[in-house]
Each structure stands twice: as C-alpha cells, then as structure tokens.
C-alpha cells in the first residue's frame, strides 16, 4: 500500500523471491538473485545458447545458461555450477562480470549478474528433471537465422544479436 503523488491510496502488486518483505527499507536492500552467462568457445566462433521449454510461456525459447545463486555462493560459483547442471560444459575463463541489473522491472525485484566467459566440454541434457533444455554452440550465421524464426528471452536476444553482428566485447 502507498499514497500516490495526488494523495490517493494505491495498491501495488509484484513478485519477489523474498517472502519476508515487510518495509520499503527491506525491499531496497540490494541482493543478487541470479546469474546469466554470455559464453563463447575458445576461438570465439560459437556462442552457447539453451533452447528450453518455459512453463510461463508454454513454449520453447532460446536463452542464456544461468540460474539462481544459492545461499553462500558468489555469482562466479553459481555460474560454474549452473553451467555444469544445465549444459555439461565447464567455464574455463571469466572475461567480464557486469554489476547486478534489475531484470524484471514492472513485475518483480529480481537482480541478475551477467557474466561473460569462455566454456568448453561436451553438451549433455540438464541434470534437473524439471528442466527441458537442449544446449548447443551456434555460429553467427546460425544465430542470425534463429532471430528470424524463433523466440528469444530478452537477455539472450540482445547478447546473441551483438555476437551475431560482431558487436560483443572481446569477440
């Protein structure tokens, strides 16, 4: 509940992973919920993308590897764990880590760290039976073609477009 600038009482509903929000001060405490990864192979010729079923959309979309940060984990530790769980790949180098970003503005309070790096290994299905993920390496041309026909998550669309068009830093 809050009072808007005209003095009218209002209700605002949002989604949060924090079940204990009891004040504005609590809401404004900065925490990082998740990590996403923008990953290439060592030659930087391919980008790793997940093709996954998203229950909230009722369809498969292309996304970036990533997931929730467990209590006590750093974003880098979570990235290594999530990458292995989702794809079977190993994170061999981290080249950039962006500060936390508000990724669900208008809906929730989630903050996500975006990590850039190099991965290697053999793809395998997700170890989580609740996740329907097919991961693979994609060339720039393949990514451009997918952009014409398939749905992407917002982070994946932005960073894969940059990769496909030679605009991704360090690639």
Model-assigned labels for residue ranges:
Residues 33-36, 67-156, 170:
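Unchanged
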Residues 11-12, 50, 64, 112:
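Hydrophobic residues on conserved beta-strands that form the core of alpha/beta folds
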Residues 158-171:
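Short, amphipathic C-terminal "tail helix"
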Residues 1-38, 43:
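Acidic, metal-coordinating catalytic segment for phosphate/diphosphate chemistry
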Residues 5-6, 41-44, 53, 118-123, ...:
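Short loop segments at secondary-structure junctions
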Residues 39-61:
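Ordered, amphipathic secondary-structure segments that act as subunit-interaction surfaces
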Residues 22-25, 58-63, 136:
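A short, polar/proline- and glycine-enriched secondary-structure boundary/capping micro-motif
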């Amino acid at each position: 509940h809050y009072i808007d600038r005209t003095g009218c009482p209002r209700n605002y509903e949002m989604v949060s992973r924090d079940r204990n929000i009891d004040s504005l001060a609590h809401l404004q405490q900065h925490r990082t919920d998740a990590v996403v990864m923008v990953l290439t192979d060592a030659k930087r010729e391919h980008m790793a993308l997940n093709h996954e079923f998203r229950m909230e959309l009722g369809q498969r979309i292309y996304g970036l590897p990533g997931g929730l940060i467990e209590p006590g984990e750093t974003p880098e530790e979570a990235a290594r764990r999530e990458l292995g769980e989702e794809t079977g790949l190993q994170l061999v180098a981290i080249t950039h880590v962006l500060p936390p970003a508000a990724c669900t503005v208008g809906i929730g309070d989630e903050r996500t760290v975006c990590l850039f790096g190099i991965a290697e290994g053999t793809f395998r299905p997700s170890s989580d039976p609740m996740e329907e993920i097919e991961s693979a390496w994609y060339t720039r041309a393949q990514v451009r073609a997918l952009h014409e026909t398939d749905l992407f998550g917002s982070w994946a669309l932005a960073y894969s477009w940059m990769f496909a068009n030679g605009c991704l830093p360090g690639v």
